[in-house]
Amino acid sequence: MTATAPVITIDGPSGAGKGTLCKAMAEALQWHLLDSGAIYRVLALAALHHQVDISSEEALAPIAAHLDVRFISHSGEIEVILEGENVSTEIRTQDVSNTASRVAAFPRVREALLRRQRGFRELPGLIADGRDMGTVVFPDAPVKIFLDASSEERASRRMLQLQEKGFSVNFERLLSEIKERDDRDRNRAIAPLVPAADALVLDSTTMSIEQVIEIALNYAREKLALV
């Protein structure tokens, strides 16, 4: 880990467009990328595969401490590797996503994964995608962005994303799950989903992803004095 490597944190709720924004910024700046949400999904998947009780913090903590996860950039996409296996598609199912939100609420699990996430900080810089990147994981990050959107818009985006991957989804159920997840994430005792005090807050509800990327890149370059 290089303590001097700059970090740009992108926080926000599920479906706001963080993943697309982070990939675009990482490519534009040629920086490393951390999808912290993927780490929690990988943990959720590992727990499901090993039939670990996802309601047991004691059972989950050691799995989190020794989680073998890597991110590999390949053909413009980020491959998520768990114990040598590409699980990029498997971790994006709604069941795994909902499980990830539940396991993320445990303090010991977050502590174990916190150390792992900070290990991704390397030169020339890191784009960190998550929910508490700017408030907990990288509080010293020079650039912090909080990306939001209405729950209805996020449900629509998620439905299209899942349909493109061949999954059958119900909009009302998806919207309900997103609202429930928002409530858990915003009101949990440990690292709730809130913008950092010094974050730029972007509401992408009525914005194209191209507009969001342009605003975020211009803001980051200005803050970091990048050409």
Swiss-Prot record:
Subcellular locations according to the entry: Cytoplasm
Chain sites annotated for binding ATP: G12, P13, S14, G15, A16, G17, K18, G19, T20
Enzyme class name: transferase
Catalytic activity, as annotated: CMP + ATP = CDP + ADP; dCMP + ATP = dCDP + ADP
Gene3D superfamilies, sorted: P-loop containing nucleotide triphosphate hydrolases
Key words, A-Z: ATP-binding, Cytoplasm, Kinase, Nucleotide-binding, Transferase
MF terms (GO), sorted A to Z: ATP binding; CMP kinase activity; dCMP kinase activity
Principal subcellular localization: cytoplasm
EC number: 2.7.4.25
One of the protein's GO biological processes: nucleobase-containing small molecule interconversion
One Gene Ontology term, aspect cellular component: cytosol
Pfam families registered for this protein in UniProt: Cytidylate_kin
Statement: the UniProt record of this protein carries the keyword Kinase: yes
Family: Belongs to the cytidylate kinase family. Type 1 subfamily.
Protein name from the UniProt record: Cytidylate kinase
Biological source species: Erwinia tasmaniensis (strain DSM 17950 / CFBP 7177 / CIP 109463 / NCPPB 4357 / Et1/99)
Gene: cmk
